Design a protein with these regions (language model features):
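Intrinsically disordered, low-complexity boundary segments flanking structured domains
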Residues: 1-5, 51-55, 100
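Catalytic strand-loop segment that frames the active site of acyl-thioester-processing enzymes
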Residues: 1-33
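Generic structural detector for well-ordered beta-strands
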Residues: 3, 12-18, 68, 84, ...
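Intrinsic-disorder/low-complexity, polar/charged segments enriched in Ser/Thr/Lys/Arg/Asp/Glu/Gln
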Residues: 6-12, 37, 64, 78-80, ...
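Short, conserved micro-motifs enriched in small and acidic residues
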Residues: 32-40
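N-terminal glycine-rich beta->alpha transition that marks the start or flank
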Residues: 43
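Hydrophobic beta-strand-centered segment that forms part of the acyl-chain substrate-binding groove
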Residues: 47-80
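HotDog/MaoC-like acyl-thioester-processing domains
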Residues: 75, 84-138
């Protein structure tokens, strides 16, 4: 991780709430930004911020998220998500996030990500897959 990753670093992402990001269970007129989609977009914004400061052999994974989804956002509305680094503790990074649509604030969140070495992570995943195979074999 580069020394440039410090508290105060920010990233803003703008997107349009498309059909895939909405709920469907309230009919066509009830299509609004789904909470799971909002969480995914928040995680993506934080990940992009980290990648701006990561070495080429690094990636990040989510550890924890807390979200207050404050207001509905209609299909085809514009959303702006802003994430900022609050703390860096070794490879663990804490973010605060705000999101707003064209009319009002829609969410506040905190999110923690962990910076990982890609090659080491792949080895851990291979080891877990081998254990899974052994467990399934009985």
């Amino acid at each position: 991780m580069k020394e440039t990753l410090r508290p105060g670093a920010t990233k803003t992402k703008r997107l349009t709430v498309d059909r895939e990001r909405t709920i469907s269970f309230m009919g066509e007129e009830g299509r609004v930004y789904a909470t799971p989609s909002l969480i995914g977009d928040i995680e993506g914004t934080c990940r992009e911020l980290l990648l701006d400061h990561a070495d080429t052999d690094e990636e990040s994974v989510g550890m924890e998220i807390s979200l207050r989804h404050l207001a509905p956002t209609l299909l085809d509305m514009q959303v702006e998500i802003t994430a900022w680094v609050v703390a860096v503790d070794g490879r663990k990074v804490l973010f605060e996030i705000s999101a707003k649509d064209e009319v009002e604030p829609i969410a506040t969140s905190t999110h923690t990500r962990f910076v990982v070495d890609v090659a080491k992570r792949q080895e851990r995943l291979k080891a877990k897959a081998a254990k899974r195979t052994a467990v399934r074999a009985g």
